[in-house]
Swiss-Prot record:
It comes from Margaritifera margaritifera. It is found in: Secreted. Residues 1-20 form the signal peptide. Prismatic layer of shell (at protein level). Expressed primarily in the mantle with highest level in the mantle edge and lower level in the mantle pallium. This is Peroxidase-like protein. GO terms for cellular component: extracellular region.
Amino acid sequence: MNLFICHVFLLLLHGYLIICQDIPPDTIISAVNTAQQEVTQREASSFSQQQARASVAAFAGAPQPAAVLAASRPARTGLDRFNRRNDPQRNTELSIGGQVTQRATLALRSSDPASAAAPAARTLTPLDARAPAAGFSASSTMTFRNAAAQSCTDSRPVTVCDPQQRYRETDGQCNNLVFPSFPSGAFKLGAAFTAQGRFLFPAYDDGVSSPRIRSVIPGFLLPNARLVSRNVHSGTAFDSDRHTPFLTHFGQFIDHDIVSTPETEPKFTMPNSHCCLEPNLEECFNINFEPDPLLQGSCIRFNRADTAPSYFCNPGPRLQQNQRSSFVDGTMVYGWDVEQENRLREPGTGRLISEGDDQLKLEPVADPLNPPCFPVDNRCFEAGDHRSLETVPLTVMHIMFLRRHNLIVQELQNLPLPWTPELLFQEAKRIVVAELQHITYNEFLPRVLGPQFMTIFRLWPAPLFSDTYSPLVDPRTTSGFSVAAYRFGHSLVRNVHDQIGPGGLPVNNLLLQDHFDRLQTHLNVFPGGNTEGFARWMKLSQKSRADRTLVDGLQNNLFPCEDPDCPMGGGVTKSFDLAALNIQRGRDHGLPPYTAWRYWCTGRRAFVFTPNAVGLSDHSPFEANILSNTYRHVDDIDLFTGGMTEMRRPGALLGPTLSCIIGLQFSNYKRGDRFFYERPDPVMAFTPGQLQAIKETSLAKILCSTMRSFSNVQIBAMDRVSPSNPIVNCDELRSQDIIAKIPFLWNQLPNRAIQSAAARASNISGRTGLRVSTRFEDPAMLRLIGRRRLYKH
């Protein structure tokens, strides 16, 4: 019976026939137990785990001998801090669970030829608790789950969800109230510190976890990622004739809201080591090449992305962690969990903490074992996301929305209503998140995707209310989106960032490579109104054109290391190549080749490099020729490279494949978000007047409200000034802004708002309790899920 169910289910949903095998329960249990023993022994004896324990103890105040601290710290650079673990304990738990399920899956596949030979499905249905993984039958999957439950357990208490709660959970829990995880029963689909999803079944070389490095031509490997970068992604980076850097860096700002993938902590055998010195460790996946004078080395050290178990603790291929919630919910402003959010809040006021002229607050002196910034600084800005210091324009975005929150709090508290600090904070956050969502779907995405894909995926904002929410939509950020498609924004970055004075003349400029993650550079830039000088440049200048090329600051000088703690030996490079990292990260995640994504999105196969009906018809002859000179076979092309070389669609920045992936992902963010700002749900809905005011919000209005020296701005801040996009007076925009309308639109508060805020304030750390749900076993629910229709386009 199980075999029959598996045949029919996968044939209907995927167009593939996978023979699902019943494996003896004892075999499954033995494989899981062996995997648990191997992983536990490895973690307990590893150098990296000793470091993690020391780091947790240091945060808890336990004294650590100086010798232990010095010996425990591996060599770090800006890239390490960019990809760092935000919560070492939770990251380690997820990593252990992921390793156990993957090792056991690999062992079972190796022992069962039928399972190992099962063809990969085109698409996944991750919400279906019944869906067999890697060729396992439903009963075998359940046996596996129960055996691996201990490794998939989350040590955090389970949040008890209140369906009548008006305000979001900080970490994204309790958004989807239909699918509890296994074994905890927590409703954390799309929450921070869970696994990323997938649109397509991965293409790992061993079917489970080994990176994709083999060509489809037997006996050959894929071309070196640095070689692909130099062949395809180098060249003159032209400026855009239409868009401003605000489009670039708003997109980056949103990226840090929806995904943060930490790297593994390799099990080094010696202090101050790195992957170029110990390349054979399983966490290392270096990019090796002939000595390169631009990078000053021959090895780009590369740690694999940290792994996590699946949502239901199923057997199956390697998944990657996401430290952010998979919703457009302002995580980069407010933090990834309650503890981080509380660190950002000003006690007793509802405001976010700021320093000086409403600038970002500086963190306390960093933990020496996990420094967030360069060792010479050892501090960085305190923000909702640890990457706020990455570039100056990104820091400007953080400061803008910090100020926006505090301005809204100031207006709300002037109203004669029963405000509490918690109610002020939550209501202001609710407004800011709605504004972020509206700008994303009304200004940013139309410029990226163009009208065709905005319409296909129903992404246009409605005139007022619209309820597209479905609990059957999986909102999770997917690997293909996070490590390839959405990285198109790297081609939009300028190599030089300027500061423009009130008179419109440049007064300062910085090379991109000189302010990556550099606190002192930012401190030199921002005092005395310099925030507004860079914001002025962002609205008046041009972004780089969307194409296949990356500027020198990203391709040859990413995170240049000049500090005493720079890694040394093993041919390690002094800087990184972002295009090569993107390609290597896609292989690390096991992303299928570009042609598989193109077929999934468009239904068109490509058999040859030639840009004709049976080849790369979405590419120009010039781009197709570059690809044919780089790859041995059309099915070897990496998703990032293939997508970035497609011809752009009319009115868009991208070609059809990346537009499809990004469009579907943002459709899922919208349709899978129970708190989406357009919903008419009586518990959390805005009033018609409030929603109309939010829909009149624009990035230009937020600029005028948060940049006090601005006297004017163009109507659409993401577009350059033109006859169709004229400059308008900021006083006019301020009079139309939602802040000016708060006294009229928020002069009443529903009882549900007061009750929800009171519940949050009185039990901010006690809103937890053990509630293990078995709803995913309900046959009626399984039948409902089985009828779920996949989007076809």
